[in-house]
From Swiss-Prot:
<protein>
    <recommendedName>
        <fullName>Thymidylate kinase</fullName>
        <ecNumber>2.7.4.9</ecNumber>
    </recommendedName>
</protein>
<dbReference type="GO" id="GO:0006233">
    <property type="term" value="P:dTDP biosynthetic process"/>
</dbReference>
<keyword id="KW-0808">Transferase</keyword>
<keyword id="KW-0418">Kinase</keyword>
<dbReference type="GO" id="GO:0006235">
    <property type="term" value="P:dTTP biosynthetic process"/>
</dbReference>
<keyword id="KW-0545">Nucleotide biosynthesis</keyword>
<feature type="binding site">
    <location>
        <begin position="10"/>
        <end position="17"/>
    </location>
    <ligand>
        <name>ATP</name>
    </ligand>
</feature>
<dbReference type="GO" id="GO:0005829">
    <property type="term" value="C:cytosol"/>
</dbReference>
<dbReference type="InterPro" id="IPR039430">
    <property type="entry name" value="Thymidylate_kin-like_dom"/>
</dbReference>
<keyword id="KW-0067">ATP-binding</keyword>
<dbReference type="Pfam" id="PF02223">
    <property type="entry name" value="Thymidylate_kin"/>
</dbReference>
<dbReference type="GO" id="GO:0005524">
    <property type="term" value="F:ATP binding"/>
</dbReference>
<keyword id="KW-0547">Nucleotide-binding</keyword>
<dbReference type="GO" id="GO:0006227">
    <property type="term" value="P:dUDP biosynthetic process"/>
</dbReference>
<dbReference type="InterPro" id="IPR027417">
    <property type="entry name" value="P-loop_NTPase"/>
</dbReference>
<dbReference type="InterPro" id="IPR018095">
    <property type="entry name" value="Thymidylate_kin_CS"/>
</dbReference>
<comment type="similarity">
    <text>Belongs to the thymidylate kinase family.</text>
</comment>
Length: 219
């Protein structure tokens, strides 16, 4: 069984943790036993330090938009080369909480950084490495931000304006529309409905990969 890299994407408050649990349950019901979880930015000692800078910023210096995106790609290549690729080579399935699509949407859409620059960075840093499947949890930014506020204090990016997240969502939607490996899930529904949609979409994809549910034999 070939290992796969599955990524969960979406705005703040989209329900990525719930989605991850559904993905794991579905994978295990199809016989996948070894699963590794990653998050971006983060996942290695260096990447975690960069995560803190990206999320919290600095008290005495502004983090510029280009510095932010360069830190994101530095953290990403550390994670991909030191964790994700070795895990895949070892036969593990990897479930990522965010990957490159986040940079294309947040920095490209939200920040307005040139898309060609972002694609050039992606291709230079990651080569042709891409997720096998991305589940994009789509919901209106106002709903997501309300959920995020209920979790507690907002980080530097979560404190951005509603217009920022509107631009980010628009870019997410455009990217999902042009890439068959990105499946869009309506995350504004109830938890049960979202879970059912994720499970159905993932089961169909797994069947396309040649994986069927494991039948439990009763004695």
């Amino acid at each position: 069984m070939n290992s796969k890299f599955i990524v969960i994407e979406g705005l703040e408050g989209a329900g990525k943790t719930t989605a991850r649990n559904i993905v794991v349950e579905t994978l295990r019901s199809h016989g996948v036993k070894e699963v590794l979880f990653t998050r971006e930015p983060g996942g290695t000692p260096l990447a975690e330090k960069l995560r803190e800078l990206i999320k919290q910023g600095m008290a005495d210096e502004k983090v510029t938009d280009k510095a932010e995106v360069l830190m994101l790609y530095a953290a990403r290549v550390q994670l991909v080369d030191n964790v994700i690729k070795p895990a895949l080579a070892d036969g593990k399935w990897v479930i990522g909480d965010r990957h490159d699509l986040s940079s294309q949407a947040y920095q490209g859409g939200g920040r307005g950084i040139d898309q060609q620059l972002l694609r050039s960075l992606r291709d230079t840093v990651l080569g042709n490495f891409r997720p096998d499947l991305t589940l994009y949890l789509d919901l209106p930014p106002a709903i997501g931000l309300q959920r995020a506020r209920q979790r507690g204090e907002l980080d530097r990016i979560e404190q951005e304006s509603l217009a920022f997240f509107d631009r980010t969502r628009t870019r997410y939607q455009a990217l999902a529309a042009e890439d068959d490996s990105i499946l869009t899930i309506d995350a504004s529904q109830s938890i049960d409905a979202v879970s059912a949609d994720i499970q159905a979409a993932l089961q169909q994809w797994l069947q396309q990969q040649g994986l069927q549910p494991v039948v439990q034999v009763q004695y």
